[in-house]
């Protein structure tokens, strides 16, 4: 049997933009993507600390070192620039594998979204 577990978590980053006219997704600095063991195109959940909204989208890469966290398409209506969000990726694992699994959880600087 498979269970869904947290695989990756970017804890408390500041939204740098919201682009309603973009096709969709969340644009992230590749440094954040790599540190959290996320993959381009991976489905993620985004939780907005400011308003309680939860949404699903997928990851695309922005400019390296930019600290970018931009919600695109319909998700742009759920955030405002400056909001604090958590980005979570999940994985399906066998129960025994899940018991031993350790997720990649990162805590970037909340003001700059840079890795600490």
Give names to the regions the model predicted.
Residues 3-5, 10, 14-99, 111-112:
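Compact, glycine-rich, soluble single-domain proteins
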């Amino acid at each position: 049997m498979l269970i869904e577990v947290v695989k990756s978590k970017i804890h408390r980053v500041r939204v740098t933009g919201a682009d309603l006219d973009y096709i969709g997704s969340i644009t992230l600095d590749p440094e954040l993507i790599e540190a959290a063991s996320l993959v381009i195109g991976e489905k993620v959940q985004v939780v907005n600390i400011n308003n309680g909204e939860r949404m699903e989208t997928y990851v695309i890469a922005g400019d390296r070192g930019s600290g970018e966290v931009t919600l695109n398409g319909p998700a742009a209506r759920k955030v405002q620039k400056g909001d604090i969000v958590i980005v979570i990726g999940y994985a399906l694992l066998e129960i025994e594998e899940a018991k031993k699994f350790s997720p990649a959880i990162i805590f970037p600087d909340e003001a700059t979204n840079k890795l600490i």
